[in-house]
């Protein structure tokens, strides 16, 4: 059953955890990014009548990686299933940088399909105009990584797979004048 109360709690926790952070290359609060990811996830049903866990993971997907929020707090507030999803979406910083995405994708594939939806939605929302300070090499590498995400996870959501493929095909978009 959908739980508006749990979603509102997750939104508040994400807002508190990400307070002071911005969307890279913009003046916008980081909360915009996590709500965009959640909105993408909400468009997918995948034959599941209750996407609450997916939406919670979308709202909280960067909290362990980018904030001081602890795994214990996440588990206490939202349970083991949400914690496992967020942990799978979190890159393991103890690994060499070039291994982190592959490791995360393997862990995501071991989770329920909704966790893959979150990663697909995350990259869809991230494939906007890159920050001005990014080099052409970084932009190219980001596009290659997006293709790796598509290759590993698109099967879990044809709808999000199509959206990600479209974003990859047009990345990087032209910066607005």
How would you label these PLM feature ranges?
Residues 1-177:
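Active-site helical microenvironments for divalent-metal-assisted chemistry
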């Amino acid at each position: 059953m959908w739980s508006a109360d749990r979603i509102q709690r997750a939104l508040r926790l994400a807002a508190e955890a990400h307070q002071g952070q911005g969307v890279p290359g913009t003046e916008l609060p980081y909360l915009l990014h996590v709500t965009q990811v959640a909105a993408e996830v909400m468009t997918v049903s995948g034959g599941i009548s209750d996407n609450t866990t997916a939406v919670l993971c979308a709202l909280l997907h960067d909290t362990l990686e980018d904030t001081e929020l602890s795994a214990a707090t996440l588990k206490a507030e939202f349970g083991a299933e949400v914690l496992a999803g967020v942990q799978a979406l979190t890159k393991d910083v103890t690994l060499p940088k070039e291994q982190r995405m592959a490791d995360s994708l393997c862990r995501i594939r071991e989770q329920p399909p909704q966790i893959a939806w979150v990663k697909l939605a995350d990259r869809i929302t991230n494939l906007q105009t890159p920050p001005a300070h990014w080099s052409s090499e970084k932009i190219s590498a980001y596009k290659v990584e997006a293709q790796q995400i598509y290759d590993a996870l698109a099967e879990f959501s044809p709808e999000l797979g199509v959206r990600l493929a479209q974003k990859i095909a047009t990345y990087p978009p032209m910066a607005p004048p």
